[in-house]
Amino acid sequence: LKQCKYMEDTARARHDFRHTLHTLKILSAKEDFSSLNQYLDRYLNEFPVNETVFYCKNNSVNALLNYLIPSALEADIHTDLKIILPDSLPVSDIDLCSILGNILENAINGCMTVSAENRNIQLSVITRHDTYLYIVATNTFNGIVRKNNSQYLTTRPNGHGIGLTSIQITVEKYNGTVQFSNDDSRFYADIMIPI
């Protein structure tokens, strides 16, 4: 849902930008440089420049990462991403983005429980030998976990705790495997999906 909103907002911004360009062209043609500078200043204050980053060949994954990674960076979280995807996968874009979105959202929340200098997320999404899709993620956190048997539970006060369950269900839909684990300072997610 957030990804769709991001794409709609981007399309609307591009459409509106045409009007901005026409206004700038008219002010420039009239050589009204004072008004031109004021207009540009207002525009830049209202719409900070966010450069689109292309992490991989998959447009849906790029849209998701361009939505989530700036939030991580604004929170002083160091991110190390390696995303190498083929042109097509048997995993739908919706399911892939659901998995990655839940992983990253949980990782960002986990990082927020430690001091800024210790915040780190590593995410690798690759295929091996054209037989498996591997998603490996790790993030720092405060080491506090809640479990019911081997099932991780949310530690957030108002959290719903369905992110990891959603990942598990989605991966199993493709006959894949998921393993979540942790040590005193890091949380790990290891996913393998046959392709």
Predicted regions and their residues:
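Conserved ATP-binding N-box helix of the HATPase_c
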Residues: 93-117
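Short beta-strand/loop element within the Bergerat-fold HATPase_c
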Residues: 118-131
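Glycine-rich ATP-binding loops of the HATPase_c
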Residues: 175-185
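Conserved short strand/loop->alpha-helix "switch" segment adjacent to the catalytic nucleotide/phosphoryl-transfer site
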Residues: 53, 57, 79-100
